[in-house]
Amino acid sequence: MNNRNKLRDFYILWSTQSLSQLGSSITAFALTLWLYEKTGSALSTAALTICSYAPYVIMSIFAGALTDRFDKKKTMLVCDTLAAVCTLTVFILYKTDTLMIWHLYAVNAVSGLMNTVQQPASEVTMTLIVPKESYQKISGLNSLTRSLVSILNPLIASALYALFGLGTVITVDLLTFALAFIALAAFINVPGSSKEVKESTLELAKEGLGFLRKTPMVFTLIIFMAGINLIASAYDASLPALIIPNPKGGSNMLGIVSSCAGVAMVIGSLLVTAMPKPKDRVKAVYVTMLISMSTENFILAFSRAPVLWCIGQIIGWILVPVMSANLDVILRNSIPVDLQGRVYACRNTFQFFTIPIGLFLGGFMVDNVCEPFMAEHAYSAVLTMLFGSGKGSGAALMMLILGIAGSLHCILFGSRLRKYHYSDS
């Protein structure tokens, strides 16, 4: 059997799930636009993201244990269906003119919980249906999906929302769900686990934590990425405050600069699918992040030109798929398939809990520390030369802080990760 036939199930699953992911993303973006129109509050829209991430932080460990207990395909189908029911509920409430803000928070929390269970099931499914020698390739394709979604999502969502309204956006989302559901239910064969799981959910969760405790390389990489996510999410919170107030910026320019990250990740994803396997995947993870952290933040901190903002985004994001692919291969090969659900779920808790913290800290630092500091020292010629003046200069200062913090994090953790080595040979 040639490699293409071996990957048939993966290609079907990947393509249809990617469309469904795009559909979910455009709905989330459109709901953000709708909510901001209703409230005019950045905090209200940020709360949507917090409601989605809260289940990740709280329930991931137990969700992974459930994944290992039950059939992976059925788990994905049930979770996707319940998430679609949430979306359908929003559609009905919107059409009957009874949609309220708290409805969105509640629906996002339930959808986030479903994603918390579905994500580790999906990760294990990929491991089961893909040959080991193709792990790097599928990691590159998954990165490509995330990149394309990040580019297309705001363009499609804003266009559909402006032309046809929220109802049409949700309809498109439900259609992509139906396509993905039919493909998974009818055409994808997911092999069963080789080991029957009899332990309780709590015991399985403890087993996932125990594996991380006994595998310091994997756990250290996860904690390293938690720090990266903290810096990156603080950056995400600071970027609008840097670009929108700038005379050469504005909301349209923010969209262009943000899309540059997606373009860079598309290029990086294509590189991953074509590049040879590195001699040491652990080194590839922390070196790529050091390059990203030590370039993008500093370029944006000291530049006032849109072209430099775009260049900074591209340099900062082009190596992210390389990091993701190498980390993904390490995890898939280091964790036994029968443990992957619970271990991936533990990974989600430890690696991603810093994202809402970073979003909060980034916004808090810009609004309450950096901008007031720059306003009080507006007379300083040195600070003005470095960060500009007026609103937005504090966000530029925050970029410098994040660049220093991110570089130090990579250097310090790099010294710890240097003792670990991983290659496919």
Describe the residue ranges of each PLM region.
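Transmembrane alpha-helix termini and helix-breaking/packing motifs in multi-pass membrane transporters
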Residues: 32-38, 91-96, 152-172, 245-246, ...
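Helix-loop junctions on the cytosolic side of multi-pass membrane transporters
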Residues: 97, 124, 128, 170-200, ...
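Substrate-agnostic recognition of the 12-TM MFS/MFS-like secondary transporter fold
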Residues: 11-29, 49-67, 71-86, 103-162, ...
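C-terminal transmembrane bundle of multi-pass solute transporters/carriers
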Residues: 75, 206, 213, 224-227, ...
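C-terminal ends and interior cores of transmembrane alpha-helices
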Residues: 81-98, 291-304
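Juxtamembrane intracellular "pre-TM" segments in multi-pass secondary transporters
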Residues: 1-10, 189-222
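MFS-fold secondary transporters
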Residues: 36, 89-94, 111, 184, ...
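Small-residue hotspots at the loop-to-helix junctions and early N-terminal turns
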Residues: 27-30, 34, 39-46, 140, ...
